[in-house]
């Protein structure tokens, strides 16, 4: 199968198209054929890994670098979100079957910039809403996960007013939708 790989940190020039082995799902995994995957800040950070890219204290840079790889990346296929179709399911998988359209968030494991990927059934994977295309569904997981965690920290209650700064971005757009439709808040969004 084809995948976009990188073996060193740097600019987009370190990315290249390569043939890699097609994964085989374990008993608790699905094999998904990737139809769409976005490029986001996590991909940029993992590929470039410059300290200036991190929005964190310098002391956290060291453990992050050890986690991702000191001299070269430990994970060499980027892509933290995807939408695609289940091609095969491990023998203990019960929630998904071949042919199901799914979307998923892979987190630091990444790997979605490939034709196929294995995802644990109990991972952050769900049936893709029928009214969304693959490209639309692939962009949802990261923004929704971040937005819901921020709204929970805010202890938002029905009827409360909330201002969402950056309402046109991936996280902000999801925060607006979740605050209004899930929490019942009065939402004002700003961007610029």
Feature annotation, model-predicted:
Residues 18, 100, 114-115, 136, ...:
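Extracytoplasmic/periplasmic beta-strand context in beta-sandwich domains
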Residues 137-192:
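Mid-domain Rossmann-like dinucleotide-binding core that forms the NAD(H)/NADP(H) cofactor-binding site
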Residues 23-38, 50-108:
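Glycine-rich beta-strand-centered segment in the early N-terminal region that forms part
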Residues 123-134, 158-160:
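Glycine/charged-rich beta-loop-alpha catalytic/anionic-binding loops adjacent to active sites
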Residues 53, 108-121:
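A structural motif shared across PLP-dependent enzymes of the aminotransferase-like
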Residues 42-47:
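Cytochrome P450 core scaffold surrounding the K-helix E-X-X-R motif
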Residues 2, 16-21, 33, 84-85, ...:
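Residues located in well-ordered beta-strands
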């Amino acid at each position: 199968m084809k995948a976009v790989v990188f073996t060193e940190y740097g600019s987009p020039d370190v990315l290249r198209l390569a043939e890699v082995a097609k994964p085989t799902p374990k008993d608790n995994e699905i094999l998904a054929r990737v139809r769409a995957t976005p490029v986001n800040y996590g991909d940029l950070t993992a590929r470039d890994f410059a300290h200036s890219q991190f929005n964190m204290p310098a002391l956290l840079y060291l453990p992050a670098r050890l986690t991702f790889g000191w001299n070269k990346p430990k994970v060499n296929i980027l892509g933290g979100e995807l939408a695609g179709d289940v091609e095969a399911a491990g023998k203990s998988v019960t929630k998904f079957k071949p042919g199901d359209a799914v979307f998923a968030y892979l987190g630091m494991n990444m790997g979605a910039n490939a034709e196929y990927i294995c995802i644990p059934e109990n991972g952050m994977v769900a049936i893709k809403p029928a009214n969304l295309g693959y490209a639309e569904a692939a962009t949802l997981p990261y923004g929704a996960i971040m937005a819901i965690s921020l709204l929970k920290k805010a202890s938002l209650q029905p009827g409360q007013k909330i201002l969402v700064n950056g309402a046109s971005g991936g996280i902000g757009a999801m925060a607006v939708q979740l605050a209004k439709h899930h929490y019942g808040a009065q939402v004002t969004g700003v961007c610029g």
